Regions:
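Terminal accessory carbohydrate-recognition/targeting modules of carbohydrate-active enzymes
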Residues: 1-229, 233, 239-243, 254, ...
Length: 277
């Protein structure tokens, strides 16, 4: 069970419709350190571990830029610059770049550690503790990567260039980029990384355009109202019927009929699409 102190600890969270990701400020997902880390689809964790190792060690965080749609993690690996750009589509899309900014050649071993356990959110919340930490699943080989499957769910993790272990010799100013995609089958990434990233970053501005806006002569109040509009979008999931507000983030990111009705009624003047959903 996650304590109140852990709930307000510094984690980075991204959400897009029914997917949300929780990680440390270096982008790593370590459920042994924070029980709720991982990629979630509704009330099921479809990826529990996601770590980057450079020459056998985890890089140290030196910078972070994150908004509602994407996050950029800046890391240092003994003088090598590591950048992780992450957003959500049908799962996680991530671009990992290792750059040699030194004046000498560097031998680099880039290794990606991944894992899945399909834990239930009820376990993370403490309602059913035995569901919080199921045994990890051994991956099987799949086209372009690996596959984890249990109880009707299957997660596929792919890498381009293929493989989760890469050895490179980088000269001064050279870099190496690896794309890692995590998707819940049968969905798979539908676009190249950059166009998909632009589309992800457009989700919240488009939502704001569809909502009623209020402007005042107080800049701080305007910023508060804009953030509140974005927060409502983050709460919402997409279903065949339309947008549906969930109860709360992160561990109540599931539909509750009463909560959704109350939220939709209050937001009728802002965006009636929620009530239709």
């Amino acid at each position: 069970m996650i304590s109140a102190e852990e709930l307000i600890s510094e984690r980075v969270m991204l959400k897009r419709d029914r997917f949300f990701a929780v990680s440390a400020r270096d982008g790593s997902m370590k459920p042994d350190e924070f029980l709720g880390d991982g990629l979630w689809w509704g009330d099921t964790r479809i990826l529990s571990a996601f770590r980057v190792h450079i020459n056998g060690k985890e890089p140290q965080p030196v910078g972070l830029q994150a908004d509602d749609s994407s996050a950029t993690f800046e890391l240092d690996a003994n003088g090598l610059q590591v950048t992780r750009v992450r957003f959500l589509e049908s799962g996680i899309r991530e671009e990992i770049t290792v750059a040699n900014r030194a004046e000498t050649t560097a031998d680099v071993v880039l290794e990606i550690e991944i894992g899945a356990d399909f834990a239930a959110m009820l376990g993370i919340r403490g309602a059913v503790p035995q569901l919080a930490s199921p045994a990890p699943i051994a991956p099987s080989e799949a086209a372009g990567g690996v596959r984890f499957a249990r109880a009707g769910h299957a997660t596929r993790v792919t890498a381009v260039p293929e493989g989760f272990l890469h050895r490179r010799r980088l000269g001064p100013g050279e870099d190496f980029t690896l794309h890692v995609d995590v998707a819940l089958e049968p969905d798979m990434p539908s676009a190249a990384f950059e166009p998909a990233l632009r589309a992800a970053r457009d989700v919240y501005p488009r939502w704001a355009e569809d909502c009623m806006s209020v402007r005042t002569d107080n800049p701080a109040l305007n910023q508060l109202l804009e953030q509140a509009t974005a927060d409502v979008r983050m709460l919402c999931d997409s279903y065949e019927t339309g947008m549906y507000p969930t109860a709360g983030l992160p561990w109540f990111a599931v539909p509750f009929g009463r909560d959704a009705l109350i939220t939709s009624i209050f937001l009728l003047p802002v965006n009636p699409e929620l009530a239709r959903g």
